[in-house]
Amino acid sequence: MTKSHSEEVIVPEFNSSAKELPRPLAEKCPSIIKKFISAYDAKPDFVARSPGRVNLIGEHIDYCDFSVLPLAIDFDMLCAVKVLNEKNPSITLINADPKFAQRKFDLPLDGSYVTIDPSVSDWSNYFKCGLHVAHSFLKKLAPERFASAPLAGLQVFCEGDVPTGSGLSSSAAFICAVALAVVKANMGPGYHMSKQNLMRITVVAEHYVGVNNGGMDQAASVCGEEDHALYVEFKPQLKATPFKFPQLKNHEISFVIANTLVVSNKFETAPTNYNLRVVEVTTAANVLAATYGVVLLSGKEGSSTNKGNLRDFMNVYYARYHNISTPWNGDIESGIERLTKMLVLVEESLANKKQGFSVDDVAQSLNCSREEFTRDYLTTSPVRFQVLKLYQRAKHVYSESLRVLKAVKLMTTASFTADEDFFKQFGALMNESQASCDKLYECSCPEIDKICSIALSNGSYGSRLTGAGWGGCTVHLVPGGPNGNIEKVKEALANEFYKVKYPKITDAELENAIIVSKPALGSCLYEL
Amino acid sequence: MTKSHSEEVIVPEFNSSAKELPRPLAEKCPSIIKKFISAYDAKPDFVARSPGRVNLIGEHIDYCDFSVLPLAIDFDMLCAVKVLNEKNPSITLINADPKFAQRKFDLPLDGSYVTIDPSVSDWSNYFKCGLHVAHSFLKKLAPERFASAPLAGLQVFCEGDVPTGSGLSSSAAFICAVALAVVKANMGPGYHMSKQNLMRITVVAEHYVGVNNGGMDQAASVCGEEDHALYVEFKPQLKATPFKFPQLKNHEISFVIANTLVVSNKFETAPTNYNLRVVEVTTAANVLAATYGVVLLSGKEGSSTNKGNLRDFMNVYYARYHNISTPWNGDIESGIERLTKMLVLVEESLANKKQGFSVDDVAQSLNCSREEFTRDYLTTSPVRFQVLKLYQRAKHVYSESLRVLKAVKLMTTASFTADEDFFKQFGALMNESQASCDKLYECSCPEIDKICSIALSNGSYGSRLTGAGWGGCTVHLVPGGPNGNIEKVKEALANEFYKVKYPKITDAELENAIIVSKPALGSCLYEL
Amino acid sequence: MDYNKRSSVSTVPNAAPIRVGFVGLNAAKGWAIKTHYPAILQLSSQFQITALYSPKIETSIATIQRLKLSNATAFPTLESFASSSTIDMIVIAIQVASHYEVVMPLLEFSKNNPNLKYLFVEWALACSLDQAESIYKAAAERGVQTIISLQGRKSPYILRAKELISQGYIGDINSIEIAGNGGWYGYERPVKSPKYIYEIGNGVDLVTTTFGHTIDILQYMTSSYFSRINAMVFNNIPEQELIDERGNRLGQRVPKTVPDHLLFQGTLLNGNVPVSCSFKGGKPTKKFTKNLVIDIHGTKGDLKLEGDAGFAEISNLVLYYSGTRANDFPLANGQQAPLDPGYDAGKEIMEVYHLRNYNAIVGNIHRLYQSISDFHFNTKKIPELPSQFVMQGFDFEGFPTLMDALILHRLIESVYKSNMMGSTLNVSNISHYSL
Amino acid sequence: MDYNKRSSVSTVPNAAPIRVGFVGLNAAKGWAIKTHYPAILQLSSQFQITALYSPKIETSIATIQRLKLSNATAFPTLESFASSSTIDMIVIAIQVASHYEVVMPLLEFSKNNPNLKYLFVEWALACSLDQAESIYKAAAERGVQTIISLQGRKSPYILRAKELISQGYIGDINSIEIAGNGGWYGYERPVKSPKYIYEIGNGVDLVTTTFGHTIDILQYMTSSYFSRINAMVFNNIPEQELIDERGNRLGQRVPKTVPDHLLFQGTLLNGNVPVSCSFKGGKPTKKFTKNLVIDIHGTKGDLKLEGDAGFAEISNLVLYYSGTRANDFPLANGQQAPLDPGYDAGKEIMEVYHLRNYNAIVGNIHRLYQSISDFHFNTKKIPELPSQFVMQGFDFEGFPTLMDALILHRLIESVYKSNMMGSTLNVSNISHYSL
């Protein structure tokens, strides 16, 4: 595991005269620049690019501060930007995809933030999230310039090939590109933003539109490196460590991504899916704390919005009952031991309500009233449910985080006697992860299950959903290289799934639906 | 400190043929028996007696489970009882003092408890408290006899010389006598009740009438021993250890009790005095727990009524921050160290609101709503207040408990170079205790302050209120024996306080107002 | 807080106890055995049950045996019962529908019993205003002191609220909201529930019982009758589903003619205070609101009474008070209400009054009997205590009489009239009793 | 939940933006600058401010400069403003008291402007029912599409509640209670508060504003007008104490003729549902109750809306729902409402809908403008979308018009009439519009 992390590492910047331009920029900048000129009949000043990501293992655990194993993929979002110099600045957005209608809004002259209407589901809201986090970064970076004066007006042309609602995190790609662009537009060519800063400010961006996600997607999009996957950690601090796959004897380690083409809009289904899961794991952490007589966060840390999480519970439990008062620093061996202990506690204290906790059940275990629990836990964002399945969700988070640690050990083992060893062991972890996502977290869907079973019986060693689930993409560990069976898997999926489910699918769509992703470069800039 | 405690020690029983009858019984039984016969024209079967008590030091800390130093005094409550054998049994109560009207009530035939109307202030309610705890003891002792059949009917004649509302705990004396009588009446001569059982069942008796006090009064009344004071501990378990005062060279250690004659009815002033203080110290414990991120009681122990107390906070604080997970066992040296630490924490976290916490302030520190705090803390018993003075009350409880430990060390020191050393040191602790009760707990009154200042300038080394305060009695450490100055103190009080405040006071009343109390025998029975 | 001083009458008075004759005490079932009987038990030497009457004498005999009432006689006829000189007080605890047909002849026969001093009748004192007026007149002519079981007036919470208001703790009353709930009158009816409480005219319904008790309590606390009122009475559930004990529907529907919702609004005579009431029939929903909420807003503070069930007169309520005590408040009787020492005038006082183990069902009736014995034995040594009084009105002392009941009946009559006529009625004159 | 789909109209439409002429937009003060202006800013290419009129032209000029309104012209006279062809939509955002005297001539002059399509008037559309009727008729004759700012209908919470009710989540509505609070109308008046809102007849008071907005929202959510209503209007505080910003009394009293309390109760046309309302004037008390509580009880579930201040149309509310989804519930339009997959029918569903950082003051007006542009550019591609519609009534689509305002005015008129006549009124006919 190369130790360098992204503290001072700068987001890569290229220009037309750069000796060798990274492939994504070389391939895609010319066309977006042409489209910009035809839309605004002016040349853009620069193009900001940020990729989508696939997550090999560790789903729905980033918002509990547990580490994950994503890698940036060859699909990305580009924003061609021209900085304007108007007295009352405004931002005009045009998207190559007609589905996203053209938008224009003015920048408040007093330098205040552009308001985001959280009750509305629109692509421009995601632009405004990137704009907001960049604006607050600039207010701290250069208060004299941005405290009470508006940002620069912009003309923006957006084009991306990360399929939306596919679980490859098109929203994070878009937000990171926008944040990078807004900082570059307002600080000028002389300022070079660090990856760490871009990652830090974008991990919370989607909260402004009401999606309470963790930071995996943005971290992978910003810190992606060619031929490197990423070990992203959120605690003790936010860190993304690139690493190469182990060298096997006669196979390459490659991951096939297959899109179920079932679109799942994280925002609109949030009340019954994504945001509900965040409420469930937060509640589980607090019920565990109440049962074992520990306080998740002391008076200072806790607040009406910060209720602590399952990683906090693990820490205060070990402080109280094992006299280890420093929080877990991510060390693998002690992590495996503690997560195993957590799974025991979950069985002990939550297994008696497998049918789910009603609001009254939870209020009783937390020793507070119905109204109190509702006010404190259910008003952070809209939710709708019959019961809260604390047992299943907590069991998934701890077992999935345990699997990530085991996966990291595999990835950092110098060598394997037989390639089969790696594929078998890593594949097993992925299959367990899929089972847990399906049975415990209930975020799979029939199409995902179908694709996984087909892939597994056609050469994939490990198949699972990737991203939030409820549709979107799946990822498969398939031996690559000459005698690999990538083609075999693609063949099987095409015939047994795509042509069956989508009889009228075109070859191009099929081409796009199944891809072999090489870890790609993270966010970068191309200055004209 | 004699190690024997009252596990198997039986409540002393005497009868007319006993060789030497204890003085209180010898003096008082004949007259009460005569009065019983004239009231019921029948002879009573036995007389139950229980004394009042004075507390040398350790006020308002028993309901926080901290130890205290009371001694039984020569004033007591006697109940002459005749057991009836009626089909539908009832209990008739006559009191020698006409102020307490005669009462009669039937015993429910199905063996259920006699209801106590907590909204009413009447002497018979205290009888019913004793009856209730005895009844529940009997239901466990002999379920087959008392589960669904009524107790025996009784004729009772009560007479006591513990002045009510004087802080010498007349209510505890009455309750202990009644509980002893009811058990004896129903179990017959063959059953001999242990002091431990009588103490255990009576410590919670007054809660049934709505006074949430600790167990000091009942423990002292039951376990009193001639020439011995008592070191009463509530945790780890309820224990009363008799000890003798140290032998001084040429003075006796004696305590003068002076009654302010200001009657303070604990029940009727409970909402603004006694019960309010119980709410304040319970709230203080929980605010401290929230501030330092510890949980007072784990899920199992805590309940809607049991909110934990300042001793629980000390224990969980040391578990969390000093890795000592076993609760404090009462050891003096470690107790002094910990209580000193607690006083530091109180300064650190509560001193910023010396003007008192509003309901909103408390709700905010406990991270719950106004309604939640009101529902959980303010509905256990009626309370009325403007602010909750958490800082002052917590500081008093911890400092007073610290003083008790120092007082115990003094009392168990083998010898003193000069008598003056003992009197000076013990007196100083008493005076600090009076200052803390006055300034921090605000449970003194002008008359108490006046009596204390007069006594201190006329030979008393230590003067303070005793019992709940807001009136009632004061206790003074005065060197006794030939060259003591008991007379000097009595003189001064009579002229500078009583004759001034109560010009028409009679000699008899004066005689009764100032007494030198020798530690007296605890509860006992006299069978005819 | 001095209302809670227990009367100093000895429960073993030197004088003879009040001898009580019961119509409707049945050891097996009914209201009296659950409330009147336990109350008398606690005051066993101030009240002594000496006579029982019920249409079937076997019932009385069985009750005497079951309860071992050593001093009680079972009377075969109403006449023999009413005229027996062994009775000082008659308690009528039977279905409201038979009040009139029992009490009128009873009063007549009772003329042969010189010892009869008290007539205690359960609310709602007859099913109509006319019947109530007749009973009242007959009792007045007969010259007995009357008692009605509007026992909500004796609840410690109501008395404490009345004390706070009368001592100026909330200043002038600004507005009042009441939301209540009458359990039986919803979509479902327990199969064992007696039919008569679902038929209009039997004197037991959402308006007469649930609203009646609560509005009497409100008037008593605020010491004011109403001046103008408007009401809308609803029967949106003409048919109810029968359910068994476990709440499962039996698939059978039964007719209901009593109302299942009451909207009532009006103004108090004192201060033209707006009062808004909504009483809902049906199973109390625990979802987002308590089932009984009385909010009283004042210029100096707020008072709130909350209960789990909708019946204020038999619930163990919680009283919340918060306000700045107006110590410059000239009390009605002119003298200065002493502000508790230690309070500084400007600051807000908070009070929460709740007695965790108070049994309201028995307790309120028990305290009503206590107030009767306080009056009978003049335990408070009130100089020249009159031998009788017509009505309690809004005094702390005494107990509610048939005149208080009559005034409440007139208000309920105007509720139905306002609904029927569709108009706001002036009711400021209903509180003048006229013989 | 599909009501929250953002219109797909591009904020940079290929067609020209709607040109807006403002009467009453003043950069320095007033309602429009705080709400209409920020809303238009967010839709900067669908609406373009092209004209301002105010009695003093300097105000218009100063506003154009301050807000840098590059396409706007300041008009010296109402006539020149109204007849200018550079305006597609006129927005009237001035004191209600001057609505009539401005809008009537404006409509007349506007006959010279063939481009005028929309007339947007702030609630309460004139100070009396007659004025409102005349304005409505004049606008209808002039043939413009009208808009009224009953923006509570656009609140995401109200729309979600409407959705839940219409999809059978609470079954049949059983009863409704509303408690609200109108800040200014209590014992104290901030010295800087404008005099006219305390004088009856200026179209701004507890009944017209606080009650008006809330009862319109209730009718919209429940899709029902009222059949019978009764009201009692109170002015118990004829004089208020003047206070400075920090709340200290200045020792000066000022007269108030607008009401400070409203009691309203009635029955909904659909289902004869009992509705009880109590609106209190004065500083919202935080003691024991929220300042706006709407409780809707149904046979299958309960809905509750709560807000901190008493103004439902500009508060960031919280919606609570709990109930068993009746999946066998035949929907109004016959088809079966799909139960979310994964729910089993019998079990109770709980929903809490709150958007922590939603700015209701700007947001609701912003969404009202959005619905105007959706209509104008037919963004939802509704086939044969009529060029005009008379009233929104209870549809999800569209926006409230002067007819919706007129119906609300008739209800408010009957509130005052019911109080004055002391009678319950039948209002089931006020919702039939007659040209």
Swiss-Prot record, chains A, B:
Residues that bind ATP, according to the entry? G165, G167, S169, S170, S264, N265, K266
Show the active-site residues.
D217 (proton acceptor)
A biological-process GO annotation = galactose catabolic process via UDP-galactose, Leloir pathway
Query: What PROSITE patterns would the database entry show?
Result: GALACTOKINASE, GHMP_KINASES_ATP
Q: Where is this site: Transition state stabilizer?
A: R53
Q: What pathway or pathways are given for this protein in its record?
A: Carbohydrate metabolism; galactose metabolism
Choose one Gene Ontology CC annotation of this protein and give it: nucleus
Xref: Gene3D superfamilies: 1.20.1440.340, 3.30.230.10
Enzyme Commission code(s) on record: 2.7.1.6
On pH dependence, the entry says: Optimum pH is 8.0-9.0.
Q: Which UniProt keywords apply?
A: ATP-binding, Carbohydrate metabolism, Galactose metabolism, Kinase, Nucleotide-binding, Phosphoprotein, Transferase
Query: Which N-terminal residues, if any, form the signal peptide?
Result: none
Give the matching PANTHER family. GALACTOKINASE-RELATED, MEVALONATE KINASE/GALACTOKINASE
Q: Name the family.
A: Belongs to the GHMP kinase family. GalK subfamily.
Which protein, by its recorded name, is this?
Galactokinase
Gene that encodes it = GAL1
Curated annotation (Swiss-Prot), chains C, D:
Per the record, what is one GO cellular component? transcription repressor complex
Could you mention a single GO BP entry for this protein? negative regulation of transcription by RNA polymerase II
- GO molecular function: any one? kinase inhibitor activity
Q: Which Gene3D superfamilies match?
A: Dihydrodipicolinate Reductase, domain 2 (3.30.360.10), NAD(P)-binding Rossmann-like Domain (3.40.50.720)
Q: Which UniProt keywords apply?
A: Acetylation, Carbohydrate metabolism, DNA-binding, Galactose metabolism, Repressor, Transcription, Transcription regulation
Subunit details: Monomer.
Q: What does this protein do?
A: This protein is a negative regulator for the gene expression of the lactose/galactose metabolic genes. It binds to GAL4 and so blocks transcriptional activation by it, in the absence of an inducing sugar.
Task: Please report which protein family the annotation says this sequence is part of.
Answer: To K.lactis GAL80.
Report the protein name in the record.
Galactose/lactose metabolism regulatory protein GAL80
Point out the gene that encodes the protein: GAL80
